[in-house]
Amino acid sequence: KKSNDLYQRASLFNITLSLPELFQVSTELDILDTNVSKGIKTLTIKGNDRIKATLFLGKTNLFETIIISNLEVLSNLSKSKTAPAMRAINLDRMVYFLDQKVGPYPFNKIVISDEDTKNNPVYGLNQLPGFLSPFPTGFEYDITQFKTLSRTYLENTLLLHPRKDAWLFGALQIYLMIEYVNTYYPKMKVLGSLSKFWIIRWSHIADLEFNDQYSLLYLNMARNNIHQPL
């Protein structure tokens, strides 16, 4: 099983990668040099004080690069209806928010991958059918991107055991998501515009705000005795 929970101290990575010329490499490490000879491309890659080294290989470059202040953000999340300029503005807001809450990101690049999003989705939003959009334009993409970005941000900066301390990563991420929604989407309902439908608005769930879902999910786990003991 691909557990992705290798635990190691921050290390210096020196990687020499040789692959067919047609392949593209995307990584949050520094690509120092690229040489092409007889159809073979050789890259020299380096990362200092890194907890992990992640490389994405493909015949086409699917990553969108956005420069935010001194940080280069690489993202291949599925595009939404949000315009590229608005995605850049939202991403700048996310990075600023994380800088204020967690501290400045210590590296030059960070990757937000679709694979990480699928492994750690925003439950509820990812289950909505494509024709149903109860939230404001860009909200779903913004929250999905923030969850993946904040998780990567934490995993790359906190030297915690990915398996034993998984609960701490999760707790910090939930805290950040609650604060982010409170700051930029106050009064957002858990059902979005569906809470105004006559068949729903009479029920208690229509009054619940987006962040109320976390306490409700915890109470459900506690009631079923499946919550993690401290």
Enumerate the predicted regions with their spans.
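Acidic/His/Gly-enriched intrinsically disordered linker/tail segments
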Residues: 164-230
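Acidic/polar loop patches that form or flank catalytic/metal-binding clefts of enzymes
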Residues: 24-28, 104-110, 161-163, 183-193
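Juxtacatalytic substrate-recognition/specificity segment
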Residues: 15, 40, 44, 62-165, ...
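Short secondary-structure junctions and interdomain/linker hinges
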Residues: 22, 52, 101-105, 201, ...
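Active-site rim elements
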Residues: 2-5, 80-85, 163, 225-230
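Amphipathic alpha-helical surface "interface" segments used
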Residues: 35-37, 118-120, 197-201
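Extended, low-hydrophobicity, Ser/Thr/Pro/Gly-biased non-transmembrane segments
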Residues: 1-54
